[in-house]
């Protein structure tokens, strides 16, 4: 549905100074619209069966490049550094299947690439969770540590053919700070057992120093991992 695609592009506020990295171009319908607005579009597609189709649909564009590679194996930091020599902003636009949403977002954040923003179409339930300030997980804390997240648009299942079983939504993450790579290990460990206290979960990392470290960070040891604030986790990284 061209109207929906144009609305999606409008939410991203891209311009000719922007280079877009698109994950999963599919048949290239969104890529085409992105190319009209962005300076350059680099698409990553894992499915080589789409080679001929994408060549046909996007071949006439001089500012689109399609790379057939699993995005999770891409050295994103290096690529963004190269692209920023030509473009003032680099952002990611992605259509993320449910089963790989977290993996892709974590890969992007952990790369520490100097992106301006991430715009992703995800399952509606996932979008509502990630933008709910009362819901906490390692991923929501990772996002909060680098910037802000918003739900920018609802996308009905009926605009797709064939229609999927669920509705989707566009989320945007605007990046203001570099990611602290020490957070990844800390958050994963803190959330290993959500029902356990932060003290019990972090003992694996800090051992006999756990009590002292929590005191230094002014964190009550009987708190659950989701009850902490991102500032608490950032304080804890200093002891790793």
Task: Tell where the protein language model's regions lie, with residue ranges.
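Catalytic cores of RNA-modifying enzymes
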Residues: 1-189
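Hydrophobic, well-ordered secondary-structure scaffolds
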Residues: 8-11, 67-68, 97-99, 215-220, ...
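An accessory alpha-helical subdomain
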Residues: 169-175, 179-212, 217-232, 237
């Amino acid at each position: 549905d061209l109207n929906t695609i144009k609305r999606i592009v409008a939410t991203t506020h891209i311009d000719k100074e922007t280079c877009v990295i698109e994950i999963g171009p599919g048949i290239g319908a969104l890529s085409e619209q992105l190319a009209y607005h962005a300076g350059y579009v680099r698409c990553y597609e894992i499915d080589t069966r789409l080679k001929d189709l994408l060549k046909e649909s996007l071949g006439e564009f001089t500012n689109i490049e399609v790379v057939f590679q699993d995005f999770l194996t891409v050295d994103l930091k290096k690529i963004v550094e190269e692209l920023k020599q030509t473009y003032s902003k680099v952002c990611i636009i992605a259509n993320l299947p449910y089963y790989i949403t977290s993996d892709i977002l974590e890969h992007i954040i952990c790369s520490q690439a100097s992106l301006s923003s991430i715009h992703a179409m995800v399952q509606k339930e996932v979008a509502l969770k990630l933008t709910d300030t009362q819901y906490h997980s390692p991923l929501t804390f990772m996002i909060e540590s680098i910037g802000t997240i918003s739900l920018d648009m609802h996308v009905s299942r009926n605009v797709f053919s064939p229609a999927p079983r669920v509705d989707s939504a566009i989320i945007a993450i605007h990046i203001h700070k570099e990611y602290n790579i020490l957070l990844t290990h800390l958050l994963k460990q803190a959330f290993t057992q959500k029902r356990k206290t932060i003290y019990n979960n972090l003992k694996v990392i800090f051992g006999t120093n756990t009590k002292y470290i929590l005191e230094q960070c002014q964190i009550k040891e009987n708190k659950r991992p989701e009850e902490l604030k991102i500032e608490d986790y950032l304080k804890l990284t200093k002891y790793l």
